[in-house]
Regions:
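Terminal peptide-recognition signature
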Residues: 105, 167, 171, 185-186, ...
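Conserved CoA-thioester-binding segment of acyl-CoA-metabolizing enzymes
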Residues: 1-49, 140-207
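N-terminal accessory interaction module
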Residues: 6-29, 34-94, 98
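Short, active-site-adjacent cap segments at secondary-structure transitions
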Residues: 107, 209-212, 258
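Glycine- (often His-adjacent) and acidic-residue-rich active-site loop
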Residues: 65, 206-239
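Crotonase-fold acyl-CoA enzyme core
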Residues: 62-89, 93-95, 243-260, 264-332
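Crotonase-superfamily enoyl-CoA hydratase/isomerase domain that binds
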Residues: 50, 86-146, 293-325, 329
Length: 332
């Protein structure tokens, strides 16, 4: 009967779980997303949806009880947080296209409100590493166009003037793609700030037409194994290093900010974007979740449901919406 229903009400979801039929949804059931109509909801969903192995998409209007949903969509224009004006079919389609990653992202974000930044970064890295062993990511690696890694002698420029430190991403020839060398250089720069309290402010920019186009695709699939990848990510974590000094950092963004290009800056005390800047989290389409800290940093600016929507759909967010949501503090 469930397979014939495009959406359920809150009582129907409760019946689904209490009746022991929770496995009727999820990747193995061919239903990685469940649309729940929130009209008349009483707030009883969290206990039920916490155990559902699927993305829970709440549909309603601002004012409805929203707890227990991973994503909240409405047809109301300019809805308040945590709603997104969108059609639920976009989330469902994204989950069906990449079910394991979509469900993993939803489950990861459910943990977020109970975790500090460091713990959330650990949880993200573990989830990312797990999905690296998954069939969709392996298929994506096998079918993608091979790219030659372009090494940069100085992937990050660091300059000091008085009490101010300037950090500049310096791979404009590849749209400042985030590679291992850039990560390591950023970690060193942020650790320098942590070690020197006389540095009172940090201005973080990117050279060229784009702040950062995300992870360098030429390096995808080069980690020896997922376990090593996790250990390296947490030993040389730009997110951890940035978190220690975030109160002194202002990020100046422009052009494309993809993946790491917004996941890391979102942690900065202040984020300023140029007109026309865009933002995107494409990782679920690869069979992964954000891996540079996005599930730990972005929700602290825009909330977990809107982060889930960004990550699941991979939609391009324009700068005006980014400001309205609080992902960006100002446009200059």
């Amino acid at each position: 009967m469930l397979a014939d229903r495009s959406s359920l009400t809150e009582p129907e979801v409760l019946d689904l779980v209490s009746g022991g039929d929770a496995e009727a949804v999820g990747p193995f059931a061919g239903r990685p997303a469940l649309v729940v109509r929130l009209d008349g909801a009483t707030g009883a969903l969290p206990a039920a949806t916490a155990v559902l192995p699927c993305v829970v998409v709440g549909v309603g209007v601002p004012g409805d009880v929203t707890v227990g949903c991973d994503v909240l969509v409405t047809d109301v224009e300019d809805p308040p947080a945590p709603w997104v004006q969108a059609d639920p079919s976009a989330v469902v389609a994204a989950a069906e296209a990449s079910p394991a990653a979509a469900v993993a992202l939803a489950q990861l974000l459910r943990l977020g409100p109970r975790l500090d930044v460091y713990s959330a970064l650990v949880a993200e890295s573990l989830t990312y590493g797990l999905l690296q062993s998954g069939p969709m990511y392996r298929e994506w690696l096998a079918t993608r166009r091979k790219r030659q890694h372009v090494a940069s002698t100085r992937p990050v420029l660091v300059e000091r003037e008085g009490t101010q430190l300037s950090i500049t991403l310096n791979r404009p020839e590849v749209r400042n793609a985030f590679d291992v060398a850039m990560r390591d250089a950023l970690v060193e720069a942020f650790r320098l700030v942590a070690a020197d309290p006389s540095i009172t402010s940090v201005e973080w920019r990117g050279d060229g037409d784009n702040f950062c186009s995300g992870g360098d695709l030429a390096e995808f699939g080069t980690v020896p194994d997922p376990v090593t990848g996790h250990l390296v990510r947490m030993s040389r974590s730009a997110g951890v290093a940035l978190a220690a000094v975030a109160d002194r950092v202002t990020a100046y963004l422009h052009g494309a900010c993809v993946g790491a290009g917004i996941e890391l800056p979102a942690l900065a005390h202040r984020v300023v974007a140029a007109p026309g800047t865009t933002f995107r989290l494409p990782e679920v389409t690869f069979g992964l979740v954000p891996g540079a800290g996005g599930t730990a940093t972005i929700p602290r600016r825009i909330g977990w449901p809107r982060t889930a929507w960004l990550g699941l759909t991979g939609v391009v967010l324009d700068v005006d919406m980014a400001v309205a949501w609080g992902l960006v503090d100002a446009v200059e």
